């Protein structure tokens, strides 16, 4: 059975747990449409990604 040789200090334990916290998602304002979107994601309103059209946008009537 695996047993630690030394006691884990509170500082080391805290450093390990510092990555466990939930972080709020980041959003950036799209420079073309002004909508908020996630970084490195497609703008779903326009279908654009990095200045290129990658999705066909459905019309509002459909």
Curated annotation (Swiss-Prot):
InterPro entries referenced in this protein's UniProt entry, alphabetically: Ribosomal_bL32, Ribosomal_bL32_bact, Ribosomal_zn-bd
Annotated keywords: Ribonucleoprotein, Ribosomal protein
GO annotation, cellular component aspect: large ribosomal subunit
GO BP: any one term: translation
Basic and acidic residues bias spans: 28-44
Molecular function GO labels: structural constituent of ribosome
Stretches the record annotates as Disordered: 1-44
Disulfide bonding pattern of the chain: none
Biased composition range(s): Basic residues: 1-16
Record carries keyword Cell cycle: no
Signal peptide: none
Gene3D superfamilies: Single helix bin
UniProt similarity note: Belongs to the bacterial ribosomal protein bL32 family.
PANTHER family associated with the record: 50S RIBOSOMAL PROTEIN L32, LARGE RIBOSOMAL SUBUNIT PROTEIN BL32
Protein name, per record: Large ribosomal subunit protein bL32
Organism of this sequence: Methylorubrum extorquens (strain ATCC 14718 / DSM 1338 / JCM 2805 / NCIMB 9133 / AM1)
Lineage of source species: Bacteria, Pseudomonadati, Pseudomonadota, Alphaproteobacteria, Hyphomicrobiales
Gene name of this polypeptide: rpmF
């Amino acid at each position: 059975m695996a047993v630690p040789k030394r006691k884990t200090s509170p500082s080391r334990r805290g450093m390990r747990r510092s990555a466990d916290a939930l972080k709020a998602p980041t959003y950036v304002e799209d420079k073309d449409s002004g909508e908020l979107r996630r970084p490195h994601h497609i703008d779903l309103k326009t279908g654009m990604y990095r200045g290129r059209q990658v999705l066909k946008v459905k019309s509002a009537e459909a």
